[in-house]
Amino acid sequence: MEHRIRIVGLGPGPVEQLTLAAWESLTHAEVVVLRTERHPCVAEILARRPSSAYTQSCDDLYTQHAAFADVYAAIVARVMALAQTHAEVVYAVPGHPCVGEMTTPALQQRAAAAGIAVEIVAGLSFIEPSFAAVGIDPMDGGQVIDAMLVAQQHHPMVDVNLPLLLAQVYARWLASDVKLTLLNAYPDDHAVTVVQAAGARQQQLTTLPLAELDHGEHFDHLTSVYVPPLPPHSSFTALQELVAHLRAPEGCPWDR
């Protein structure tokens, strides 16, 4: 018997944003594992699933482990155990399975080693509705970075002349650490926007100075922070572009 894991994206918000393929998978599968029930569309999905179907959440694993790496390893182990005893297991994750989802590559690796097929069912990621909420086209140089990575840096490894979206600013302490890193490159009064529940009915935007980013209480698993670019020619990258232009064949003859 062939075994298969179907990783399904729940999208960023309400059930209306689910793809048809995701809806069909979630409402008809015999076994569904939710990485978390803390998602706007989960309640309606559960209401539409047959009473005889098996559904399990992984929220309990977040309280059993202190480090995210251990949580993700436990989630992968849970899905793999079910996949080895059932023909198909649907594993549902927020957003898109391949955007900011650490369990997806880990599960793909474990499944490949066990000879279990993996199928990705796409979902709308948080990126599109977040950029849409602040009126920015991400194709205009948009940068998307996990807030945790920025918080671990002393100086932000970003281009300050381009739009920046910080993902998963889920707690006030994380917002504080992010703020301290960003203040090494942006002025205190630089206006940033906290994007809450992008694309959902309860979407909220709060614009405030960077120095006050961590003053509010509006941080959870649906929170992103948008940082607008600084004026042109205010970064080292811009200086490199200027020097390259001057030294180019069509540049300044004195600099070649």
Show where each model-derived region lies.
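Beta-strand/loop-alpha-helix module characteristic of Rossmann-like adenine-cofactor folds
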Residues: 2-8, 24-27, 31, 37, ...
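Class I S-adenosyl-L-methionine
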Residues: 1-121
